[in-house]
């Protein structure tokens, strides 16, 4: 499971690209690329815990359930605060809301001992990892701790004149909508191009 998590994390980290917004298409593309880089054994094991579904199927799950009573505690997990130098530290953690790093690290700790967990616990924490890795690589989800980023911006593309959009929605939806009319698989084909040796170096991590 530890190798499985590393593959998920590295796949999303190194194949995420600013061309995405992180609505459904962005999250599913990140998950699709991660899925393509899983071993057959890891993929089979993950899908066992996910009820036969792929990680792509659950890529957007956290957004769909964050406002439900059962998962309301995860509502603050979708962003991560940084200081003026773009550095994160645990001192920036709001203990009442948590953040993406807190949620991701918590899920990884549980999954490292997945054999001791119930199937439902493994499943929900896999869903957290699948989604939060994507969120962590969307610019709108990394926020200055002293700034809430709740404002509108003018966004113009080749199809429309400048319109006001909530800044978060520009990254989540508008950019991908106007950049290419591609399917999730087509995005994955275009972005998942690193040679095997580079992928192995990435998965090895850094000290």
Where are the model-predicted features located?
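Sec-dependent signal peptide recognition
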Residues: 2-8
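N-terminal, motif-rich segments that launch catalysis or mediate targeting to/interaction with membranes
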Residues: 20-132, 139-207
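Cleavable N-terminal signal peptides
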Residues: 8-9, 19
